[in-house]
Structure formats: C-alpha cells, structure tokens
Amino acid sequence: MNINDFMFTLINELNENLFYEVELYKECNKYDKTYLLRVIAKRHNKKYDYGFSIHENWLDSISINEIINFLLMQ
C-alpha cells in the first residue's frame, strides 16, 4: 500500500473535524505511527495513550496494516 492509498483509507475512516490535521500530516509525506495513534485516540475522544502504554518497542512491533485494520474495525 502506498502513502496515497494509506491516507485515502485513513481520511475515509476519520471524523471530518480531523480532515485538516490529516491534510497537514500528508504534507510530511512519511509514516509516523505515533501520529496515527494520536489521531485514533482523538477520533474516540480518549486520552493519548488510548488505554495502553506507548513504548518504542510496541511501536516497532506494530505494522501500518495493523493500524489500518484497527481503524477499519471501529
């Protein structure tokens, strides 16, 4: 999946009020898992940690596809 497909999927899954922030993210032209987790948390009006600890090891172990799948399941 390329960045355009990924961002299209993400935009379709997000609330409209996050569209501007996602557009800013697209400008970065990179994958940033921490950013994606913040977006997911905001989407659900939760705290940043979304009920789990964010550690570098955990971020390294999760794939972009897993994050997309998480979004699609919501």
Question: Residues of each region from the PLM?
Answer:
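Acidic, low-complexity, intrinsically disordered interaction modules
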Residues: 19-63
